[in-house]
Amino acid sequence: MARKQVSRKRRVKKNVENGVAHIRSTFNNTIVTITDEFGNALSWSSAGALGFKGSKKSTPFAAQMASETASKTAMEHGLKSVEVTVKGPGPGRESAIRALQSAGLEVTAIRDVTPVPHNGCRPPKRRRV
């Protein structure tokens, strides 16, 4: 019985010079997605995907590592400069932006797009430890 040939789709290297780095920083994790200007993802990384578990995911160091790995794979596509959009109140906000700069990407703008409710849902009750 002959095996059917399966054609695998290869990843095409895009030539993108300008992009957008979306940093989603929550209290539990930090997710960094780098896209082109139209929103098509070039690379992404998160603290959990790098092997950090539990409360270590929410550290600034984990956010820095996630930002570095996402920027390195995006620079293989020819990325040179990024606009940064930051969403969320987490501890990894500033360290993720600094890691993008130290990786060799030029940060042209930093935009805070954290959603603010106009008195919407009731927030979770205070934690008592």
Swiss-Prot record:
The keyword Ribosomal protein applies. Part of the 30S ribosomal subunit. Interacts with proteins S7 and S18. Binds to IF-3. Keywords: Ribonucleoprotein, Ribosomal protein, RNA-binding, rRNA-binding. It holds the Pfam family Ribosomal_S11. It comes from the Bacteria. Located on the platform of the 30S subunit, it bridges several disparate RNA helices of the 16S rRNA. Forms part of the Shine-Dalgarno cleft in the 70S ribosome. One of its GO terms (molecular function) is structural constituent of ribosome. The gene is rpsK. One of its GO terms (cellular component) is ribosome. InterPro entries: Ribosomal_uS11, Ribosomal_uS11_bac-type, Ribosomal_uS11_CS, Ribosomal_uS11_sf. This is Small ribosomal subunit protein uS11.
